[in-house]
Regions:
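N-terminal signal-anchor transmembrane alpha helix
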Residues: 3-28
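Long, glycine/tryptophan/cysteine-rich extracytoplasmic
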Residues: 20-78, 128-173
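Membrane-helix exit/interface motif
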Residues: 64-71, 91-99
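A hydrophobic membrane-anchoring alpha-helix module
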Residues: 14, 172-199
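Membrane-interfacial loop-to-transmembrane-helix junctions in polytopic alpha-helical membrane proteins
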Residues: 3-6, 74-77, 101-108, 167-177
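Hydrophobic alpha-helical transmembrane segments
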Residues: 10-14, 18, 77-97, 110-120, ...
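Juxtamembrane membrane-interface segments at transmembrane alpha-helix termini
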Residues: 119-131
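Juxtamembrane interface at the cytosolic side of transmembrane helices
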Residues: 2-6, 92-122, 189-206
Length: 206
């Protein structure tokens, strides 16, 4: 159980990487841009991949009626997500410490993982809703008004995950370093659960 508890203490600490590294990355490539434009989405705001990328993206979006990219104060998520991550890191490592001291059993480990998974799904849903609003809620007075073949207004929603073609841009939307660190930490808590379960079964057979 002690080995499982050590894994449970360490696993949630990987989520601290979200305070340093981006969670998600969106890149836009086109022939007129030798170096693609990109944004890194952190839990506390959106930042350029290269200097002036946000400024250039906002400039392009202005012509087709899209909103400017939000600043941290424009979205409640950018103040709430760091708080949630901090709480989950504290609770996860506390559960691991209590497990090491024999105060809780291994089932608490998977409980933390399930709560974190639900929060992750909710976060992805919220992110997708923002992408929908960002790509479809266009300014009716935009300089360029493009329509689909059926006459409906064209959507500029970036993909939630993967690649897509938008006008002459190739757009990619993929997890970044922070997301992979979070995934690694969460998988460590799953391993901690099964390690603790195995130790419990071996102990009960003696």
């Amino acid at each position: 159980m002690k080995k499982a508890s050590v894994l449970m203490i360490i696993g949630p600490l990987f989520l601290l990487g979200l305070f340093v590294f981006p969670l998600w990355n969106i890149m836009l490539g086109a022939p007129q841009y030798p170096e693609p434009l990109g944004i890194n989405i952190h839990i506390d705001g959106i930042r350029d991949v290269n200097e002036f990328d946000i400024q250039n993206i906002d400039g392009l979006n202005h012509y087709i009626g899209m909103k400017t990219l939000p600043k941290p104060e424009d979205m409640w998520e950018f103040s709430t997500f760091p708080l949630i991550i901090g709480i989950m890191v504290f609770l996860g490592s506390l559960i691991g410490l209590l497990g090491y001291l024999g105060k809780v059993n291994y089932q608490w480990f998977i409980g933390w993982f399930l709560v974190m998974s639900v929060l992750g799904v909710m976060g992805m849903y919220d992110f997708n809703q923002w992408l929908i609003d960002y790509g479809t809620n266009l300014d009716p007075n935009a300089i360029m008004k493009l329509a689909n073949p059926d006459g409906t207004p064209m959507s500029y929603k970036p993909p939630l995950f993967g690649n897509a073609k938008m006008l002459n841009f190739d757009v990619s939307s993929l997890p970044s370093t922070g997301a992979w660190m979070m995934f690694t930490g969460m998988m460590m808590t799953v391993i901690a659960f099964f390690t603790g379960q195995r130790a419990h079964l071996l102990k009960s057979k003696k």
